[in-house]
């Protein structure tokens, strides 16, 4: 703050006089482009500047930037008092509040949000850090009837029961690690937003919501996940609990599921879904006669683009093994599989059900070679549609495993145009020999080009890419990837 004040005091008298002749509205527009802390520091320039910063339409306030809790509370209260007199023009507010004691900022945040939400607020971002349940900030009733709000992010707050919600302009909402009065409260909140398009929900094990229900006629993008926090070590025990997620969103185009332990996953009206990501931990009820898994996979079977973790792929493979009739992913054109554990997954089962796949990326993180990936047969897409394959090997992955997988595609893909082996670290002698053997293999496709890429920094220089095309022309060129 002192450096900012010195910088402001460094203005020449002529410059200060020139700026002071501008209207408050113009000065506030100039201050808008400064960080909030520096904009506030202009209040010491003169009596003319004392309150101009209060007209800024965008404030980003962090309680940690203040010398004490009382200073932070006093600052906000002063702003609100001025706004009541001057008719606040605040459009965007971000509050980052660190609560180390139960009485810190007690009820203040609720009061502040209750005030700004009644005006022309369009963008609200509230995050509370280092809290305990008894320290949770309760969102005021006025928040639920903010007529101008189009963006809302709430992080670690408490949302109670409300009888009426009116958010006619809200298009983007992020709800992260909050606690809710009950699951009906959350369902009502989501379904009462008539133009909501982008929704992300990060759940907590103890958020009072067992079954998350997302019912929306307007939603186009959805992200759902669990944050385990201190419970992560024991997350396996939560599989036995009745967590669930139900999604009914006919306009949904993009769905991302991350670290989700819900036994039940029900999706309906997914005809518009174009892309799905299933990352991290994954669980779904897989009892032999249970229809939950079948209905889930059928529900997402129309996607064109899929990114999936090996855990989710394992569940899918397990399901395909037990069912005579499995869903076909006929629209699937692009697939990325992240492999981070050694529990074997059989890709053939899934690829057999993806007859029109054109592009495939395998990202290898695991250290254990033991049957991480296997193929029980040559899938149909290798014989008719697959044109691009990339094997990405992280610095923790096994290069020889990646090359072994690449070998299968080179030997069996009829229309393959390019295969890339992408390593995050340089190849040692054993891996180089394996790659040279890969280059020497007879290729099922006459168009196939094999490329090796080593990341910049892993060998002391720029990325280098070596490729061998069908005519055996050997090239060495910088990587542009």
Swiss-Prot record:
One Pfam family it belongs to: F-box
Limits of the F-box domain: 17-64
InterPro entries: F-box-like_dom_sf (IPR036047), F-box_AtFBL13-like (IPR053781), F-box_dom (IPR001810), FBD (IPR006566), FBL13/AtMIF1-like (IPR050232), LRR_FXL15/At3g58940/PEG3-like (IPR055411)
SUPFAM superfamilies (UniProt xref): F-box domain
Domain of life according to the entry: Eukaryota
Protein name: FBD-associated F-box protein At5g44490
Residue ranges of every copy of the FBD domain listed in the record: 370-423
Lineage: Eukaryota, Viridiplantae, Streptophyta, Embryophyta, Tracheophyta
Signal peptide from the UniProt entry: none
């Amino acid at each position: 703050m002192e450096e900012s004040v010195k910088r402001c005091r460094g203005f020449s008298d002529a410059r200060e006089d020139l700026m002071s002749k501008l209207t408050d509205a113009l000065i506030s527009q100039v201050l808008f482009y400064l960080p909030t802390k520096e904009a506030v520091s202009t209040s010491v320039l003169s009596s003319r500047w004392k309150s101009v910063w209060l007209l800024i339409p965008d404030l980003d306030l962090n309680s940690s930037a203040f010398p004490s809790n009382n200073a932070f509370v006093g600052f906000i209260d002063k702003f609100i008092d001025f706004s009541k007199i001057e008719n606040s023009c605040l459009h965007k507010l971000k509050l980052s509040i660190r609560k180390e004691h139960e009485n810190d900022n007690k009820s203040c945040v609720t009061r502040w949000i209750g005030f700004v939400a009644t005006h022309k607020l369009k963008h609200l971002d509230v995050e509370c850090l280092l809290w305990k349940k008894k320290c949770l900030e309760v969102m005021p009733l006025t928040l639920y009837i903010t007529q101008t709000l189009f963006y809302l992010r709430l992080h670690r707050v408490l949302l109670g029961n409300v009888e009426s919600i009116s958010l006619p302009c809200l298009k983007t909402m992020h709800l992260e690690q909050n606690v809710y009065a009950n699951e009906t409260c959350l369902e009502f909140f989501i379904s009462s937003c008539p133009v909501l398009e982008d929704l992300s929900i990060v759940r907590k094990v103890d958020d009072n919501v067992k079954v998350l229900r997302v019912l929306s006629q307007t939603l186009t993008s959805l992200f759902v996940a669990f944050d385990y926090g201190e419970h992560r070590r024991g997350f396996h025990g939560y599989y036995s609990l009745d967590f669930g997620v139900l999604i009914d969103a006919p306009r949904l185009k993009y769905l991302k599921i991350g670290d989700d332990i819900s036994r039940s996953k029900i999706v309906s009206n997914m005809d518009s879904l174009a892309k799905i990501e299933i990352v991290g931990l994954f669980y779904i009820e897989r009892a032999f006669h249970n229809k939950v898994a079948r209905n889930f996979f059928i529900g997402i079977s129309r996607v064109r683009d899929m990114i999936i973790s090996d855990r989710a792929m394992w569940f899918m493979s397990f399901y395909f093994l037990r069912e005579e009739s499995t869903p076909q992913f006929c629209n699937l054109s692009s697939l990325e599989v992240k492999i981070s554990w050694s529990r074997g997954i059989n890709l053939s089962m899934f690829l057999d059900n993806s007859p029109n796949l054109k592009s495939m990326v395998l990202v290898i993180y695991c250290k254990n070679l033991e049957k991480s990936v296997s193929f029980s047969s040559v899938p149909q897409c290798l014989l008719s549609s697959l044109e691009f394959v990339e094997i990405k090997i992280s610095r923790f992955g096994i290069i020889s495993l990646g090359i072994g997988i690449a070998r299968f595609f080179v030997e069996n893909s009829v229309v393959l145009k390019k295969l890339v082996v992408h390593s995050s670290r340089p190849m040692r002698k054993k891996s180089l020999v394996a790659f040279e053997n890969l280059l020497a293999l007879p290729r099922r496709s006459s168009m196939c080009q094999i490329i090796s890429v080593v990341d910049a920094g892993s060998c002391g220089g720029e990325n280098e890419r070596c490729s061998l095309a069908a005519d055996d022309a050997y090239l060495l060129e910088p990587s542009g990837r």
